[in-house]
Amino acid sequence: DWMRRFEADRTLDMMTVSIDSFKDHISRSLGRGKGDHTKYVKRAAELCQTFDVDLKINTVVCRSNLNEDMRESISELDPFRWKVVQMYLVDGMNTNVDNPLHDATDLAITREEFETFIKRHEDVQCLQSEPNERFIRAYLLLNERMRFLSTSEGGKETDSILDVSVADAIEQCDFCSEKFIERDGVYFERRNHNHEYCDGDVAVD
C-alpha cells in the first residue's frame, strides 16, 4: 500500500534491495532474512515492475557465495543496476574477533577470487563491479552509534551525528568526493511526471 502513495506524484523513482545469495540457507547464515529472503526480494522486484520503479540490486561477494552462479536469478529480477562489491573488512565494524556477530574475517576473499565471480557474470549488462580499491574513501559508512567510519584509517570513528551536524562529521572522516564520483556513485537522474529524466536531480549510492 505504501508504494501506491508514491504512484501519482512519482516521488519514488528507484528502490534498492540487497541479496548476497539466492540460496536461502546462505542468506540466513550471512544475516539476511530467516530463510525466506529470496521470496521478499522477488516480491520487491514485482512491485517495482507494477509501479514502474527502477530496481537496483546490491550483492556483496564473500567466501560463502563466491562460487554461486546468479545470472539466471538476476535476469529474472531485471534490475537496471546490479552493484557487485568485494567484501571489505573495516576495523570496528566487521573485524571484532571477540564478537562472532561482528567478525567477518573468515568471509574475506582476494581480488583474484572476486574477479572469478565477475568473470562468471560478465554477460550481465547491468553489472557494476566494485573491488576493494574502489571502496576506499569512496563510501560513507555509518555504525550503530551513528558515527561515520574511516575506510582507510583502521575504522577511525567520527563524532556521532546525534551530537554534531552531518557536515561536521563528514569533515572528520576520510571521505573523498572525487573518489565517490570516480566509482560512478552518481548515476541516476530522477524522472518527471512524464517519465522523462530531469537535469540535476540525481541519486547517489
Give a label for each model feature.
Residues 2-4, 69-70:
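Short acidic active-site motifs
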